Structures are given as structure tokens and as C-alpha cells.
């Protein structure tokens, strides 16, 4: 009788976990479809980059439309206003005049400036490795490339990204706190003024 009850319990657990997996997969599919149809996307992020022997902090704005994307430094004040363009479907940065050498965090091009385009690319077409609920947020782990995994925390109600971790070489290299997320037909370009 114990074996029978144990077997039934295991089957129920597997069925229940499968239902939750479908829920996260559906949320992932809906998010990708929503971002694919959005004409524009903009947000601000406080980014913390973890180098081998130092930590660097930036406040960056991101804006994307049919012509591509743009990352602009809002802080630190010393480099505020430096921006880079990203062609549609790419994560390679093209600087407008000034080149900002923030240093790469891995051998595959991850840097503080490239982190936001890489995150957006993962949100659009990254494969979902896992999904769970944590502190009232929906969390998805997305495999962006063979080398990059993005873990993103969303508000459960509308799947708005709130924070993200970008992991490469087995460790988290970039932390991002996301605010002012706007998507749709024509969100305003982010305010590029600094305080």
C-alpha cells in the first residue's frame, strides 16, 4: 500500500510541476510576442558590472525602434551623454564620435554598455531554461546564447521587467535594476538629461 501511495504522490507532483512549467512557458511566449509587435521600447537601468577585481556602476537609458537601438550613459556624470547605436537584430555597439572603453566582462562581448541590448535580445528570443515565482515576482531564466544566461524578475501582473542578472563564464557579471519600462506604438525616447 505504501508503494502505491508513493507512486500516486510522485505522479501528482509531476503533473502539478508540469502545469506550472506551462504557465511560465505561456508567460514567456506572450512576452516575446508582445515585444515583437512593439514598435518602440524604452527603459532606464541602474547597472552594476562585476569585473575580476573591481565593480563599476552606471545609469543607462535604452531606446529601440525600427531603426535600431540606442544606449546612453546617464551616470556617472563624467561620461554622461555618451551613447552608442545598435543596428536592428544586433548587439554590436557603434559609438557616435566618442568611444567609451568600459572593458569587456567576458570573451564574448559582454560589457556594461552592451548588457542592455543583450538583455533585450534575450527577452525577445532567448530560450527559457526555467521559471519560478519569488517574492511576488515571476522569474524567468533565459538562455540568450551558449555563453550568456539572463535571469529576469517581472511584475507578475503585467510581466514588466524589474531587475535582471546576466551570467557568463559561470558567474553573474551584470546586475540591472530596471525602471521606466515603456513599450508599444510610440513610447517617448528616454530623458537623457542628468541631475
Identify what each model region corresponds to.
Residues 1-17:
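Sec-dependent bacterial lipoprotein signal peptides
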Residues 13-65, 185-195:
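N-terminal leader/targeting segments and the immediate start of mature chains
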Residues 33-37, 81-85, 129-131, 151-157:
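Short linear motifs in intrinsically disordered
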Residues 41-47, 54-73, 82-84, 91, ...:
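One face of beta-strands
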Residues 48-52, 76-78, 98, 147, ...:
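Hydrophobic lipid-interacting interfaces of membrane-associated proteins
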Residues 63-118, 172-174:
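An acidic-aromatic
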Amino acid at each position: 500500500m505504501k508503494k502505491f501511495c508513493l507512486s500516486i504522490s510522485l505522479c501528482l507532483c509531476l503533473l502539478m510541476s508540469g502545469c506550472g512549467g506551462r504557465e511560465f512557458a505561456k508567460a514567456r511566449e506572450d512576452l516575446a510576442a508582445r515585444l515583437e509587435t512593439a514598435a518602440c521600447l524604452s527603459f532606464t537601468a541602474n547597472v552594476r558590472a562585476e569585473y575580476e577585481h573591481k565593480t563599476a556602476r552606471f545609469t543607462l537609458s535604452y531606446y529601440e525602434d525600427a531603426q535600431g537601438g540606442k544606449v546612453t550613459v546617464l551616470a556617472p556624470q563624467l561620461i554622461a551623454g555618451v551613447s552608442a547605436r545598435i543596428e536592428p537584430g544586433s548587439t554590436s555597439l557603434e559609438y557616435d564620435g566618442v568611444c567609451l572603453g568600459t572593458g569587456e566582462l567576458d570573451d564574448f562581448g559582454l560589457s556594461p554598455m552592451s548588457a542592455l541590448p543583450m538583455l533585450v535580445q534575450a527577452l525577445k528570443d532567448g530560450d527559457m531554461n526555467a521559471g519560478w515565482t519569488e517574492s511576488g515576482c515571476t522569474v524567468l531564466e533565459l538562455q540568450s546564447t551558449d555563453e550568456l544566461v539572463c535571469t529576469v524578475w517581472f511584475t507578475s501582473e503585467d510581466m514588466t521587467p524589474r531587475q535582471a542578472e546576466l551570467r557568463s563564464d559561470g558567474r553573474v557579471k551584470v546586475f540591472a535594476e530596471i525602471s521606466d519600462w515603456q513599450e508599444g506604438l510610440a513610447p517617448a525616447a528616454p530623458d537623457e538629461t542628468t541631475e
